[in-house]
Amino acid sequence: MIVKRLNPDALKNALQKIGPEKIAQDRMHQKGVSFVFEIQHLPLSATLILKQEAISVGGDFATPRDCILAKEPFYDGVLIASAKQLERLIVKCHSQPFGLKHLAQELKSHLKAPKPNTPQIMAVLNLTPDSFYEKSRFDSKKALEEIYQWLEKGITLIDIGAASSRPESEIIDPKIEQDRLKEILLEIKSQKLYQCAKFSIDTYHATTAQMALEHYFSILNDVSGFNSAEMLEVAKDYKPTCILMHTQKTPKDMQENVFYHNLFDEMDRFFKEKLEVLEKYVLQDIILDIGFGFAKLKEHNLALIKHLSHFLKFKKPLLVGASRKNTIGLITGREVQDRLAGTLSLHLMALQNGASVLRVHDIDEHIDLIKVFKSLEETD
């Protein structure tokens, strides 16, 4: 059984995909819902029970037209319910067999998901000669100028990396990475810039992470997903905020033969397992990064933005970094330097669907984006 929470805006398409009678589709769509879930591979008995229980609380469970004939052992469906209806349905399912108790627990995690935090900008600073976006590449002098400008603009999160993680990039020697960082780290520590903003180190090397944390960085952004025991030990010693990003393989080969049986189910398992590991190391201040563009195709990236609220069930802030990435180019046909509009479109929808942190290259435009977004949120 696989459960994926859908954006309510996707209800019409989800109903058409399942294929109930047209008159039933129209009736279900008119109910006006707070929660929509796509439930896959549900046993027949559970399907029939869930249908009746959902209707009994005022919701509905859309099933394929031939489900009533009970020809198949498993069925997919779309669950539609308001928050109140879902609360009552969870109680009913909790005492039922055929896997419905597990379903109730899964639904409850979504019902209890917290509202997103006030959105924040995480500015990207790359001390690399090969970052995919040329204007984000800085030497130490230019990088320091940029940091001071960002601080004047009120930026409170700054992510600094000295090794490219773009697709097909090679893993570099940590000594090269650390040499690129040295001057920046000294300035941040000596001038106490860490009192003005939180600095994040973007690295997959434990020794580089330790070096940055010793210089008062307070966020560890490990793009390998905390795969190494060494990185976990460093995190345990310094207790930074940890950014846990979903990916597969390494930057060099992550876009080769990308395949998921079910993207959301596999990401759920990934985050659950990794969060358990981090908890064992007494690390609880965690931000989840969906890994937009990391081991994902265009359709994966777009689905993650559209149904981002699915991951709110983990009760962690969600980070999205779609800034100028290839998916935008595939849609618009534009090169990286001309992808600002596409970036803003994706990031606005990410905020609407639960993102708390946007990792961005274009600071001024995103400051304006968040101002407008917050104004809309506050408007009656």
UniProtKB/Swiss-Prot annotation:
Residues 1-104 are annotated as: Dihydropteroate reductase. Its EC number is 1.5.8.-, 2.5.1.15. Mg(2+) binds at residue 126. GO terms for cellular component: cytosol. Its cofactor is FAD; FMN; Mg(2+). The keyword Transferase applies. Residues 105-380 are annotated as: Dihydropteroate synthase. Changing residue 92 to E: Unable to bind FMN. Keywords: FAD, Flavoprotein, FMN, Folate biosynthesis, Magnesium, Metal-binding, Multifunctional enzyme, NAD, Oxidoreductase, Transferase. The keyword Cytoplasm does not apply. GO terms for biological process: folic acid biosynthetic process; tetrahydrofolate biosynthetic process. Pfam families: Pterin_bind (PF00809). The N-terminal extension of FolP is essential for the reducing activity and binds FMN. NCBIfam families: DHPS. In the C-terminal section; belongs to the DHPS family. This is Bifunctional dihydropteroate synthase/dihydropteroate reductase.
